[in-house]
Amino acid sequence: KAQTEEYDGSSFTEVGDLNTARGGSGSSMNAPNASTLIFAGSPGSGTANTESWNGTSWTEVANLSTSRWDVGGAGDSVTSAIAFGGSISPGVTTATEEWTAADFEIKTVTTS
């Protein structure tokens, strides 16, 4: 579904819908600024679509490099966010990408 709802502390109200309906997407949020970034998701073999919420409507922004679903996300959604992991067809990915309000860039993560 592309439906978006906002919670005011006691009830939900439908607001501007996503441009691309999806499930299994990742997101990052900056609550004081009412901004949100949503990326990836399904149906099909995953999507790279990314949209930004400004408190009123969704806008298409730079897409992920790797289409996927069931992806993790973190960040403030105003200036930067990361998308990590997720499912691809077939299998899973460990790809990590950083969004900087202009584009997604693939990052290499080293663990020890």
Residue ranges and their predicted role:
Residues 1-112:
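Polar, enzyme-active/binding microenvironments
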